[in-house]
């Protein structure tokens, strides 16, 4: 539950007026985000890292890299329940606002025609920076996940690198061509974001589709989709999962019946619990 704060107009003297969460949080580990900056493609970008519970600097730890959706969205120093769960499970958790994110103006957020290019490079540079700043992270035990645009990037990443020990692709995009004719926003959003002239510009749409590069994938990947998701329809995950299965790569799909694109935020409580359990179990299987 959100607390109520007051502060001066200059942002100083912040005071919390309510304490709704004190009892619930008193016996739980709450990781505090550590902000870091890094340089990628000539720009200074922001990221954050959560340390695992009972952190011991003499030990090596697994990690989770969580990519936000949008791409016009933004992370901050806020409470993210799933990230806190993973930190309590003994993982470092790191996340960042790459090119395409909100919060730094339209020019920064506009990556139309650049999906899979500058954003991918930013994500890899951030991973390198995190490993440099936190040498207790085991580079062979980094898990990666994301939903919506973050699911697109997850699918893109597994087709372009095998540096992550496992991945979880949620409500994702794998094929801009099929999505153009199945998604509620496909006919106009997809060509606009891919820099294509129309939904029939198949060559351009295919160039930006993770499915094109799936034959390069080696990463064990869990796919999570809702069967009532009209934004990123179920077949987007099924195509990518089938491609991995045909290559003999370990893969699994969890379909949540009756849920929508909003499963992780406003789905039925039992489904939200099951979703997070499936993700965490996948991480534990491959990183512990």
Can you annotate each of these PLM segments?
Residues 11-12, 18-140, 147, 179-181, ...:
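Cap/lid segment of the alpha/beta-hydrolase catalytic domain
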Residues 8-11, 199:
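Low-complexity, intrinsically disordered regions enriched in charged/polar residues
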Residues 1-6:
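Structural motif
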Residues 95-288:
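Active-site-proximal cap/loop segments of hydrolase catalytic domains
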């Amino acid at each position: 539950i959100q607390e109520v704060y007051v502060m001066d107009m200059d942002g100083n003297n912040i005071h919390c007026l309510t304490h709704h969460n004190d009892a619930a949080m008193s016996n739980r580990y709450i990781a505090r985000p550590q902000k870091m900056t890094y340089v990628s493609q000539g720009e200074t970008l922001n990221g954050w890292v959560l340390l695992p519970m009972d952190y011991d600097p003499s030990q090596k730890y697994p990690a989770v890299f969580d990519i936000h959706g949008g791409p016009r969205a933004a992370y901050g120093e806020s409470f993210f329940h799933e990230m806190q769960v993973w930190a309590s499970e003994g993982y470092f958790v790191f996340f960042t606002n790459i090119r395409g994110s909100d919060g730094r103006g339209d020019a920064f957020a506009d990556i139309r025609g650049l999906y899979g290019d500058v954003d991918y490079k930013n994500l890899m540079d951030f991973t390198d920076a995190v490993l440099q700043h936190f040498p207790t992270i085991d580079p062979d035990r980094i898990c990666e996940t994301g939903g919506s645009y973050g699911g697109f990037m997850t699918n893109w990443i597994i087709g372009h690198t095998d540096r992550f020990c496992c991945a979880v692709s949620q409500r994702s995009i794998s094929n801009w061509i099929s999505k153009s004719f199945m998604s509620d926003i496909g006919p106009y959003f997809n060509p606009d974001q891919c820099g294509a002239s129309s939904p029939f510009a198949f060559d351009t749409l295919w160039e930006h589709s993770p499915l094109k590069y799936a034959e390069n994938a080696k990463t064990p990947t869990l796919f999570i989709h809702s069967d009532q998701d009209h934004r990123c329809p179920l077949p987007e995950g099924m195509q990518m999962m089938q491609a991995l299965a045909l290559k003999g790569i370990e893969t699994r799909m969890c379909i949540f019946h009756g849920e929508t694109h909003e499963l992780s935020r406003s789905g039925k409580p039992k489904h939200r619990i099951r979703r997070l359990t499936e993700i965490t179990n996948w991480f534990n299987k491959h990183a512990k």
